[in-house]
UniProtKB/Swiss-Prot annotation:
It comes from the Eukaryota. The gene is MDR3. Residues 824-833 have a biased composition (Polar residues). Pleiotropic ABC efflux transporter involved in the modulation susceptibility to azoles, including fluconazole, itraconazole, ketoconazole, miconazole and voriconazole. Residues 153-408, 850-1093 form the ABC transporter domain. Dermatophytes showing reduced sensitivity to antifungal agents have emerged in several countries and, in particular, up-regulation of MDR3 expression in some clinical isolates such as strain TIMM20092 leads to increased resistance to voriconazole, and to a lesser extend itraconazole, during clinical treatments. It holds the Pfam family ABC_tran. Azole transport activity is inhibited by milbemycin oxime. This is ABC multidrug transporter MDR3. GO terms for cellular component: plasma membrane. It is a multi-pass membrane protein. It catalyses: itraconazole(in) + ATP + H2O = itraconazole(out) + ADP + phosphate + H(+); voriconazole(in) + ATP + H2O = voriconazole(out) + ADP + phosphate + H(+); fluconazole(in) + ATP + H2O = fluconazole(out) + ADP + phosphate + H(+); (2R,4S)-ketoconazole(in) + ATP + H2O = (2R,4S)-ketoconazole(out) + ADP + phosphate + H(+).
Length: 1503
């Protein structure tokens, strides 16, 4: 940081001469308004910034160059120049918080100031030139779907490939690319999906995960090599992906403030602090992108309410802008924005490039002409080939000269991309045989062109002007160095110093906590509740030997609760990982800075939880009540919490996928619990697993807690042997305390002796253990911090199709065998042209007319009624394609939902009729609704998804064969033959965007809708060619008798010509126009022109012209109230007359047989169930990750437990160990439960969002099938779980003396099956009514903890406070433990181990039998030396039944307990169905108030 950077200096003066004023604001007017004034906030004001500085310097670079070239004379300006950062109030146009703010003037002013001091503000620009750029990857164009049967084979193939024993298939993605984009220029990248647009951007920006550059690539950034730019100057060339990754809990203002502060330079304008800089830059960018009104709104995501999707996209744009990179690659960043906001975004880029010299490379879909005209250059890609690069204006002429024709009113961008589509390009007459046909031919024509020769000449000249490692590199380095904090190293790509990064990340961490306190509060409240419950169970422990086991149990439970308090941090870290990796690529901060800051930010919450939990536990249970011992207890507990937090963070950081983190973690946690030293003492551990205890931090903590509690302490004996009648006068060495460590004749037992005899613990180990725990803490802290810097998340694969095994198409197999790069490329296959008859002829022609009149829709917002739709009229007739258009927020989708009977709240009034009759229960299943989101079951193939819809939604009277045959017709009609057997999958591994949209349409057509088809934004987010293909498909459907109503967002003129009628809505849901469009939309244009609108230019897009006419386009205004004009027009009178005519005539017409079915569903419930159950089984079979994870949980932990307690002896400790083996088996429960929930949620989401509204099948069929599908897998997995657990432990040996080995083995097998069935049905019950799997998992975990505490293992029912006995009886695990333990060890003699034998002296003159015989008759036990007279050896428990009675287990009740467990399973099933009905099934027909407008009547129902 420069010494003067914080000093207040005189503001520079000077102004531009009038004749030299930059006038670009006239060309690109980019001004925003802000409804919120940003005052000085309590942000940290330390040395933290660079992101915004980079941007300012970018601006400075351009102007200083202009000034040197004579473009600006800023040295001799007499008038004072305002510093916008300090004095913007004096000029509203420079104040981002003012409605008059002008971005162009602001930029000009900043550059005017910075250009006066080129030494303080050295400029930095980065154009890019590239030649011989070839990029390839490895993989296949198709893959076969994994399922339970073929996963091992697939895994083996993967291992072979990793070892290099199987040759990879090379896929060429980009071939021989060359280009030049100078600083200050904008390049638009055009091409169809799969043509390589994203790869081009990723390569230029250094995002090359999974990509490989060929030898000989020549990519230079204005004198800087590709390698040097992406190593030493990371963040100077950045890639902005399509996806939005932000912290949802943070406000928009804080999100952007963070980005501004992280890149705030050291060489800011004089007198401007980092805080002032960051706040002002944030306000400027928010104003520029019309985000000012969202400054205090949370960003949100799909689960957390926040800003809209379009606003979230603009936040990503703002964040990238604030990074201030001289070269920015934008990958489809306008996706999700309407055309107005997309245009504003591109204009803002133009301003940045013009004034600051930045370079923008933008891949954009559906670019309107106004957007395209802003760009300087264009590049056109065709399946990995470059077929044009050059001047954007020249591009159109280049292809016309080649022989292609551009239709009137087609935008240049659409024309250029249509050239790459054989079915859409138009050839001029006479050129049919002369134009290129294949991508290679296009590329060859480009290489032979004069345009390419000129380009290569320009590249040569450019590279000579900026030679590698020349003066430009030094300037670039000097510019970056000027921005960096003084303590930042020269080679670092980051602007801030490391401590500044940590401080800034801590600020953000606390803002995130403040934005969502629910997790912290839930954790504190949950821990208070759990501590109170546990403390009450172990309440006020007596200082006698009776408390030995319960004190151990308590400390065991306490240390586990402390240790695993941070286990969910794995999920938290994974959710934020994409954000941190993105910011690292932007060079905002080190990932390790975020790692350290997150530890520090979490510390107060951890400390609060630890204090509350441990205070309650310690003092309510009467643990050793001295200050010193409490603080030792707290110190070890809290240190263990921190250590285990680092352990879980390290696991998350070193894993490249979430499953890599979660599966080992569950087994890892099980190992830590078992080898803590309580469930199996150190001396009893088997040698092959004993090493685990040495690397287990919890084991050291538990030992120290036990030493802290028992060391140097005497416990009064609670029970003597012998005692009772006849032994009242026994004293001295003739009696002994019934506890380990007891000495004959001594009334107390030493805590130290007890620890030594039972656990092999020694007091000298306590502080040694603390040192070991701290060492673990430091080691895992180092691993965590190092891993965050070195390990990145696994990138997604390239776009490939996936097929079931054996169904990969022949053409893809051939490409794989021949290793033909072009055949194997990720190209998008064209729809197959079908020969013969038109496949759409198979569509059933619709005959009904759907018409509506005076439709209004009102909802209540903050107790005030708001009208969303206002007296909308219209109709849809068979064979017509009707467009529903309007400005953003006009209510287009809402009208579609109201008409389709899909709204769930509010008041709907008006008439909606089918052939003059009211809609009935069957209306929803008789209509098709193509939703905007393409929601399908990922594991289904295209054909299966279509068949599922046809089987369930076509009438029951239609034969099965006819339904299946119709599906084949739909596949041919939609051109889906090549991928009919392809799996839906996910984007990247499955269908691409267009294929998904076609499937969404196909699913609705396969249902043979009797009435009409609704389409909601079918072209949103698609490229122009895909949008065109979807519109032509809708046109084809309409031409064959379908009635189609489609919402569409500002389409091109070409798309609009496909529609017959238009319903146009203004804001507030008011009608602006309803009627015919006419040829070339002449009818529509005539209507508006006749009502006073300006003439529509011949080359204009009527859709955009119409928006300008009504004042809805950016910058447009109108004095005409167009909804009022429509309301009073003759056209509306004619619409009303025709509606009345339809109502009277059609109501008299008899209904066709297909329309007389009034049932809610097409199929009976039992058929629904069979079809849905079949799909559910199919889903599980094709989800090998889930099944094999489930199998791992059934095999690995049980095997681990089995060999941990291998061949346990029938001693007192052995029986207790066997009881703990059962206890450990139950710990699998939460993992099994949480594992199932996400799969249920996926199915339920699909059902509730798409299948339930369309009345595909009943919720009853869905719930029953989702519960039943688990049963066969549970039965199958019972086999390995039984053998891996039952036999290694040696339960079968206990049954040998009773001759009941077979019976007991069968009973144990049944009990394990019951356990697995209980787990799955309990999971179904918990998640049935809950939205998120995480919430369900937390509830299940809480229930599990309670049932585990009260099942009688850790605390016997006799030691339990009377209040909690009801929980003991309520816990299902009580009956499971009872049944398993009695089956496993019942009716067996106990053989005491040497350290369990009690030794005492008999009374004088008596043998041991004579002395202890009476005692054994009423108290039990076995005399091992009956004839001895000097020393008796006595085993306190003779048989296992006596041991079982001590924990309230009776052998003869095991079958009763099994019956009770079946009752719990049945309860879970009924509960799952009941909770789903209660919480998620709409209770009334429509869930809305409905009424008929003329009568103004509404039947009220609650949503």
């Amino acid at each position: 940081m420069a010494p003067t950077e914080e000093a207040n200096v005189t503001k520079p003066t000077g102004e531009l001469r009038p004749d030299e004023k930059l006038n670009y604001e006239e060309d690109v007017k980019c001004s925003g308004s802000s409804s919120t004034t940003v005052g000085k906030t309590a942000y940290d004001t330390d040395d933290i910034s660079q992101s915004q500085a980079a941007e300012l310097q970018d601006l400075a670079r351009q102007l200083s160059r202009a000034s040197r070239q004579g473009g600006l004379d800023v040295e001799n300006e007499p008038q004072q120049v305002i510093n916008p950062f300090l004095d913007s109030e004096s000029d509203p146009e420079l104040n981002p918080d003012s409605k008059s703010f002008n971005v162009a003037k602001w930029l000009k002013t900043i550059l005017q100031i910075t250009s006066r001091d080129p030494e303080r503000f050295p400029k930095r620009t980065a154009g890019v030139s590239f030649r011989n750029m070839n990029v390839h990857g490895y993989g296949t164009a198709a893959d076969y779907q994994s399922d339970v049967g073929n996963l091992p084979l697939k895994a083996w193939s993967g291992i072979m490939s990793m070892l290099g024993l199987r040759k990879k298939v090379r896929i060429d993605i980009l071939r021989d690319f060359e280009g030049l984009v100078k600083s200050g220029e904008m390049l638009v990248v055009l091409g169809r999906p799969g043509s390589g647009c994203s790869t081009l951007l990723r390569t230029l920006s250094g995002e090359t995960h999974g990509l490989y550059l060929d030898e000989g690539n020549d990519i230079q950034y204005q004198g800087i090599s590709w390698e040097q730019m992406h190593k030493n100057f990371r963040g100077e060339v950045i890639y902005q992906a399509e996806t939005e990754t932000h912290f949802p809990q943070m406000t928009v203002g804080d999100t952007l403030y963070f980005a501004a502060r992280a890149r705030a330079p050291a060489n800011r304008l004089p007198g401007v602090s980092r805080e002032q800089y960051a706040i002002h830059m944030r306000s400027m960018v928010m104003s520029m992108l019309s985000l000012s009104h969202t400054i205090n709104t949370q960003v949100g995501n799909e689960y957390i309410r926040g800003v809209s999707g379009g606003e979230r996209k603009r936040i990503s744009i703002a964040e990238t802008t604030l990074s201030g990179s001289p070269l920015q690659c934008w990958d489809n960043s306008t996706r999700g924005l309407d055309s107005a906001n997309a245009l504003e975004f591109v204009k803002s880029l133009r301003l940045s490039t013009k004034y600051s010299g930045t370079t923008a490379i933008v891949a954009i879909y559906q670019a309107g002409q106004a957007i395209y005209d802003i760009f300087d250059k264009a590049v056109v890609l065709y399946e990995g080939h470059q077929i044009y690069f050059g001047n954007a204006v020249r591009a159109k002429e280049y292809f016309i000269e080649m022989g292609f024709d551009c239709p009137s009113r087609q935008t240049t961008a659409d024309f250029l991309t249509s050239v790459t589509s054989p079915s859409e390009r138009r050839v001029r007459p006479g050129y049919e045989s002369r134009v290129p046909q294949t991508p290679a031919e296009f590329a060859q024509r480009w290489k032979e062109s004069e345009d390419r020769r000129i380009l290569m000449q320009e590249i040569d000249e450019y590279n000579k002007t900026y030679p590698l490692h020349g003066e430009q590199l030094q300037k670039f380095q000097a510019s970056r160095l000027a921005e960096k904090s003084r303590s930042t190293s020269k080679s670092s790509p980051y602007t801030l110093s490391y401590p500044m990064e940590i401080k800034l990340c801590m600020w953000r961490g606390f803002q995130r906590l403040k934005g969502d306190m629910s997790m912290t509060l839930t954790s504190i409240i949950g821990n208070i509740a759990m501590s109170l419950i546990i403390a009450s169970v172990f309440y006020n422990q007596q200082e006698t030997t009776d408390s030995f086991f319960s004190r151990g149990s308590l400390l065991f439970f306490a240390i586990l609760m402390n240790a695993f308090a941070s286990s969910l941090e794995i999920l938290t870290l994974w959710h934020q990982r994409p954000i941190v990796e993105k910011h690292d690529k932007y060079a905002l901060y080190h990932p390790s800075s975020e790692a350290i800051s997150s530890i520090l930010v979490d510390m107060p919450a951890k400390l609060a939880v630890a204090i509350v939990f441990n205070l309650i536990i310690y003092f309510m249970t009467n643990l050793r009540r001295t200050p010193g011992h409490f603080f030792i207890f707290f110190l070890f507990s809290f240190t263990t919490t921190l250590t285990m937090s680092n352990v879980f963070r390290s696991i998350a950081a070193v894993s490249r996928t979430l499953s890599q983190a979660l599966v080992p973690t569950s087994i890892f946690m099980l190992a830590l619990v078992i080898y803590t030293g309580f469930t199996i003492p150190v001396r009893d551990m088997r040698p092959w697993f004993k090493w685990i205890s040495y690397i287990n931090p919890i084991q050291y903590a538990f030992e120290s807690l036990m030493i802290n509690e028992f060391h140097d302490r005497e416990f009064k004996c609670a029970v003597y042997i012998p005692s009772g009648p006849g032994y009242s006068n026994v004293s001295g060495t003739s009696k002994i305390c019934a506890a380990k460590g007891a000495m004959a004749g001594k009334p107390t037992v030493s805590g130290d002796v007890f620890l030594r005899e039972t656990y092999s613990y020694y007091a000298s180990h306590m502080w040694r253990n603390y040192g070991i725990i701290v060492a673990f803490f430091l080691f895992f802290l180092f691993v965590y911090i190092t891993a965050t810097e070195l390990v990145s998340a696994k990138p997604s694969k390239g776009e490939i199709l996936v097929f079931p095994k054996g169904k990969v198409p022949a053409f893809l197999k051939q490409s794989k065998k021949k290793q033909d790069p072009e055949a194997a490329s990720t190209q998008e296959k064209q729809p197959v042209e079908t020969s013969g008859h038109d496949q759409t002829a198979a569509i059933v022609k619709q005959t009904s007319v759907f018409h509506w009149e005076s439709v209004c829709y009102d909802i209540k917002i903050k107790k005030e009624s708001r009208r969303i739709l206002d007296n909308v009229d219209g109709w849809v007739k068979p064979g017509t394609l009707t467009a529903l258009m309007g400005v953003s927020g006009a209510g287009k989708t809402t009208l579609l939902d109201v008409l389709a009977n899909r709204v769930t709240m509010g008041v709907v009034t008006g008439e909606m009729l089918v052939d003059g009759r009211l809609r009935d229960d069957s209306f929803q299943r008789k209509t098709g609704y193509v939703q905007q989101q393409d929601l399908h079951l990922e594991i289904s193939t295209v054909r299966e998804a279509l068949t599922f819809s046809a089987l369930l939604r076509q009438p029951n009277t239609t034969p099965y064969e006819e339904k299946v045959a119709y599906v084949e017709e739909v596949i041919k009609m939609l051109g889906m033959e090549e991928y009919a057997n392809a799996v839906v999958g996910v984007l990247g591994e499955g269908l691409n965007v267009e294929q998904r949209k076609r499937l969404t349409i196909g699913v609705e057509i396969a249902a043979k809708p009797d009435l009409l088809l609704f389409f909601d934004e079918p072209t949103s987010g698609l490229d122009s060619q895909t949008a065109w293909s979807i519109c032509t498909l809708m046109r084809k459907l309409a031409d064959h008798g379908q009635a189609v109503l489609c919402t569409i967002h500002q389409p091109s003129a070409m798309l609009m010509q496909e529609f017959d009628r238009l319903l146009f809505l203004a804001s507030g849901g008011r009608t602006v126009y309803f009627g015919e469009l006419g040829k070339h939309m002449s009818t529509l244009i005539e209507y508006f022109e006749s009502k006073g609108a300006p003439k529509c230019p011949p080359d204009a897009n009527p859709a955009e012209w119409m928006l300008e006419v009504i004042g809805a386009a950016p910058g447009s205004k109108t004095d005409i109230d167009w909804p009022a004009v429509w309301r009073d027009s003759a056209e509306r009178v004619e619409v009303r007359r025709h509606l009345a005519e339809l109502k009277s005539e059609l109501s008299q017409k008899p209904q066709t047989p297909r329309l007389t079915g009034y049932g809610e569903f097409a199929m009976p419930l039992w058929k629904q169930y069979l079809i849905v159950q079949h799909r559910m089984f199919q889903q599980y079979w094709r989800s090998p990750d889930y099944i094999y994870s489930k199998a791992c949980l059934a095999i690995v932990p049980t095997l681990f437990i089995g060999f941990t307690f291998y061949k346990e002896q029938v001693s007192l400790q052995g029986i207790q160990n066997q009881m703990f083996a059962i206890f450990m088996f139950m710990i699998l429960f939460p993992n099994l439960v949480q594992q199932m929930m996400p799969y249920f949620v996926i199915q339920r989401s699909l059902y509730e969002v798409r299948e339930r509204p369309s009345k595909t099948y009943s919720w009853i069929a869905f719930m029953i099938s989702s519960v039943v599908v688990e049963i066969p897998w549970n039965a199958l997995l019972t086999v390995p779980a039984f053998f891996c657990w039952y036999y290694p432990i040696g339960f079968y040996k206990n049954a040998i003396p009773t001759d009941a080995v077979t019976e007991r083995s069968g009973t144990m097998f049944l009990l394990i099956l019951i356990f697995l069935m209980f787990s799955s049905t309990f999971s179904s019950m918990v998640i049935a009514g809950i939205e998120q799997a995480e919430t369900g998992g937390n509830i299940a975990q809480l229930c599990f903890s309670l049932t585990l505490v009260f099942c009688g293992v850790l605390v016997s029912p006799t030691a339990m406070p009377g209040f909690w006995i009801f929980m003991y009886r309520l816990s299902p695990f009580t009956y499971f433990v009872s049944a398993v333990l009695s089956t496993g060890v019942g009716r067996t003699d106990i053989v005491c181990a040497a350290n369990e034998i009690l030794r005492l002296t008999p009374a004088a003159g008596q043998t041991c039998m004579e002395y202890l015989g009476p005692y054994t008759k009423f108290a039990g036990g076995r005399i091992l030396t009956p004839d001895a007279t000097d020393m008796c050896e006595f085993c306190a428990v003779a048989d296992t039944d006596t041991f079982l009675k001590g924990v309230n287990i009776i052998f003869d009740e095991r079958w009763r307990n099994i019956g009770i467990l079946f009752g719990y399973i049945a309860f879970n099933m009924v509960g799952a169905i009941g909770l789903y009905w209660l919480l998620r099934v709409p209770k009334r027909k429509s869930g809305v108030k409905q009424g008929q407008q003329p009568q103004k009547q509404a039947n009220e129902t609650k949503a």
